[in-house]
From Swiss-Prot:
This is Phosphoglucosamine mutase. Its EC number is 5.4.2.10. The modification Phosphoserine is found at residue 101. It comes from Rhodopseudomonas palustris (strain HaA2). GO terms for cellular component: cytosol. GO terms for biological process: carbohydrate metabolic process; peptidoglycan biosynthetic process; UDP-N-acetylglucosamine biosynthetic process.
Amino acid sequence: MSRRYFGTDGIRGRANGLITPELALKVGQAAGLVFQRGDHRHRVVIGKDTRLSGYMIENAMVAGFTSVGMDVLLVGPMPTPAVAMLTKSMRADLGVMISASHNMFEDNGIKLFGPLGFKLSDDVEKQIEQLLDEPMDKKLSESASLGRARRIDGVHDRYIEFAKRTLPRDLSLDGLRVVVDCANGAAYKVVPEALWELGADVISIGVEPDGFNINKECGSTSPEALCRKVREMRADIGIALDGDADRVIMVDERGHVIDGDQLLAVIAQSWKEDGRLARPGIVATVMSNLGLERFLASEGIELVRTSVGDRYVLEAMLRDGYNVGGEASGHIILSDYATTGDGFVAALQILAVVQKLGRPVSEVCHRFDPLPQILKNVRYRAGRPLDDAGVQSAISDAEKRLNGHGRLLIRPSGTEPVIRVMGEGEDRIMVEEVVDTIVDALGNASAAAA
């Protein structure tokens, strides 16, 4: 069965476009029915980020879940990994995060977690999709069996304590000046507080959400403001989270960006030295730079690659017994601590290495020289541009030109109508030329189909 709603990271789209109150209500009903297993009273944890449409979707989902007899625990704006953690901690049957992650406020989405805090499998998502297209009137609970909803206090402190416990008890961030950019998103309350409790000198930006400014010129996808602030405040390091705090990008004392590949290199090498790697390898995606792979090989660490998407990274980690994985975009999964990507917990591991080594972040976090990599996005309105004959010809010509001295990766986004074109190789000029040729062909195909 083709998937109409679920992409690589839940359901995502324009608020009041794809993501309507009607859809949110039905997702609540369908997911509630799928997860009513056993004879106990069933519960769902619902969190959200700070975008305006979160109120609308939250209320619709509460109506959906309670209409099929599920109790709802509302935790308000919280990071996605916090919702996953709370789902397991509070013995809930299901967790929901209302967020479109790094997208702008106009979009929103619904991410679902099972009772152990893991994202749902494809099979479970298909079960929910099937119910979305069925009438619900005969599946609703009797009046006496309807669910209840309540807001839960103290959840911020729970997540702060959870994050702090990922560091050794005797490790302090005293003496470290940290600028943190919370993207005006879900982490704006918890992360600055946690850093302060750990002893850091904290300077916060992106902590004034108004419903519209999430990810707007801030956060992990727009680190320029953080780079400027780090230089201005002469900070030791900067941390940029995205809107739901499941990814992180960092900045060194010079204001230079440290991407997810460099963060993976730091954590992998440090954990290997400390005997903390479950296996002599880590998991990343096909988007990770070849420079990372070469560096890890020199350290005796294997790089296992998956398709793009943190869910595929986690699947490989769980299947093959790895405990470190991630993406260049900043999704870092440390399965000793979390069931999903946790930007703040990953950042804490980097801060721990910085404190341990006592060296500038620019030295600690530059483990390899990345090969030139060009990534461009082509947005399209209709059709299947990748099937166009002109596009296929451009791709074939580009591969011949690279002739084994680089690689191409061309794929549709799983969350939006965008085709991502990535080229990588030792000759930057050649890589730029072949990527631009493919981008032009895709643009022409998209225009012809519109």
